[in-house]
Amino acid sequence: MNNPIPSNLKSESRKAAKILKEFTTISSRNGPDKIIPPHVIAKAQGLAVLSVIKAGFLVTARGGSGIVLARLPGGRWSAPSAIGIAGLGGGFEIGIEVSDLVIILNHERAVRAFAKGGNLTLGGNFTVAVGPLGRNLEGDVAIRSSAAVYTYCKSRGLFAGISLEGSGLIERKETNRKFYGQDDIRAYEILFGEIFRPTEAKELYEILDSFTEKYEIEEQSVNMRKMAREQRKEAKSSRPRSFPSSSGNDGQLTRPVHKVYPDLPSHSVPDRSSRGDCVVATALYPFEGQHSGDLPFQAGDKITVLTKTNSQYDWWEGKLKGNIGIFPANYVSVN
């Protein structure tokens, strides 16, 4: 876990970048269904990233430090503002626990409430809910809620539930003053774009911007998947599937190239029958498939890639055990 003791904004920004990576990268502990989806961060109006320590004996006390950022009108992220978190809770918990916490502010009013007042009480005027996990953008409609705030908590490297009702995000004015060199600087100036983004937070901004890129790619991929399914349905209903014979291939049938995403730059890989070499991908994680036309597989399966784009945050077309379908490219590694 990361250090919950308050530090300067440069260190807090580095810590926030590290935490976001841990919450959004597929690893041995985080399967594809155990990461914050790109669209959650891409659509957020603000977010806070903190490390929190909780100590309990009959009454639990919580404290920690981190930063908060807001989405500016042009879509860019604001400069970071240093914050702390504090709260008390009931229960018969005994012991000390350190956790990492990501708080997604879904509504602009939540950002404004914090920026103008300097503090924000969670669970007061704003509903708080555990945020959705997984990368299935098509399930976005099912998981949408009216919650103003999503929370994600990791303890000992694993996602865990946390109750933040009554906890408050507190502006660390002195830390902001020292970092930005202005005696009277306030959170609303930082979060409303009146302060330039510091170069010390470059790594954090690169990570945040990548979520918007991933979301746009996934959104386009979902639309292309829907179009591809409709085209397959129309083709099946209008005529039987047949392939013309290739004159230079001794009468063998040649599979036509099918671009799953015609608007994306792609590289088509011929079938093994028409060329001696091919691209083979090894499945890193199991994929059960969610729609007809998906290609399910297990970890370790060898998939022949038929159509691919230049991004691994996309859907590719492949062949496995005689079945052809599309699959998420970041579930595999290309041999």
UniProtKB/Swiss-Prot annotation:
Pfam families: SH3_1, Ysc84
Keyword field contains Cytoplasm: no
GO terms (BP aspect): regulation of ruffle assembly
CDD domains recorded: SH3_SH3YL1_like, SYLF_SH3YL1_like
Disulfide bridge partners, by residue number: none
Protein origin, superkingdom: Eukaryota
GO MF: phosphatidylinositol binding
GO cellular component, one term: ruffle membrane
SMART domains: SH3
Swiss-Prot/TrEMBL keywords: SH3 domain
Region listing for Disordered, in residue ranges: 225-274
Entries under InterPro entries matching the protein: SH3-like_dom_sf, SH3_domain, SH3_domain_YSC84-like, SH3YL1_SH3, SYLF_SH3YL1-like, Ysc84_actin-binding
Basic and acidic residues bias spans: 227-237
Ranges of residues in domain SH3: 276-335
Family of this protein: Belongs to the SH3YL1 family.
Name of the protein this chain belongs to: SH3 domain-containing YSC84-like protein 1
Species annotation: Xenopus laevis
Taxonomic lineage: Eukaryota, Metazoa, Chordata, Craniata, Vertebrata
Protein encoded by which gene: sh3yl1
